[in-house]
Amino acid sequence: MSYRDIVVHLTLDPRNAARIQLAIGLARRFGARVSGLYTVPPPNVPYYMGEYIPTELIQKQMDEAQKASVSAHTEFMSTCAGAGIEHRWLSSELAPVEALRLTVRASDIAIVGQPDPNPADPSSIPYGTDVLPHELALQAGRPVLAVPHNGPVAEIGRRILVAWNGKREATRALHDAMPLLRSAETVHLVTVGPERKGRTMLAEVTEHMQRHGLRLETAIVDPAGQKVGTALMAEAQKRQADLVVMGAFGHSRLREMVFGGVTETILSSMSLPVLLSN
């Protein structure tokens, strides 16, 4: 398996450039095509206007959306052409989760942005992106690579941390990330919890991964009262990982939020790219 078809999400977001560069890096490594999928936001009507919506307001927002689309198109096409990779432009008026879900099912991996966990103005979050990484991972049937909402994003895949708990979601993530794992300098296989249980969980999967020629280091992390997601991100930083691979747990983002899920913790505190799979 390899990544030969990559979809990158583009929207009203200054982080488009970071996602495009990450997609180009993967395309060069795997000989892939990159599809830039731009999702057109609907008019944003303030709630206090009720049913009365001035035509001028709608037209202004449509004009701004058109300008943003042209800007994103120019940036994507020129950057990919300059990099010499195969690429194409796609546009959709569907909500981001729906548009990406339909597109990525005929692709290998989707690259999306992490929503800002602490926006100064919640209305500034691009339409539909506040739930994007987690919901897409649960629905798409393909791996989803989430890019942090700030900070530099270097080339990924040299030092990878795999979060392992022996469950179906983690198994799916492990195999969906195999193209990256095979070319990594080091793979850190990490489980969080009691040592005895951790050793049992790591033993069989370690042997399996070594059969794929992976260079492995294993670790059992004591959360010491922290959330599991917080402990995993701390371990990733400690080991200078440039990518975290994990299962997208839960049946919905709401359920994850209610029960304080690992996925939600990771997505709200991530400082490096995270590959999610379900």
Task: Map each language-model feature to its residues.
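Amphipathic helical "hinge" segments at domain boundaries
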Residues: A68-C80
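Aromatic/hydrophobic pocket-lining residues that form π-stacking "cages" and hydrophobic walls in ligand
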Residues: A23, F76, L100, V205, ...
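Generic structural signal for helix capping and beta-alpha/helix-loop junctions
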Residues: N44, V97, P119-D121, A154, ...
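Short, flexible loop segments at the rims of nucleotide/cofactor-binding pockets, characterized by
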Residues: L12, H87-S91, A120-I125, N165-G166, ...
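Gly/Ser-rich helix-loop-strand patches that form or flank binding pockets
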Residues: G25-R28, A99-P152, A236-N278
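Structural beta-alpha unit
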Residues: M1, S78-A110, R211-V244, G250-R255, ...
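Small/aliphatic-rich secondary-structure junction motif
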Residues: M1-E56, Q139, G151-P152, I156-V221
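A short acidic, glycine-rich active-site loop
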Residues: E56-V70
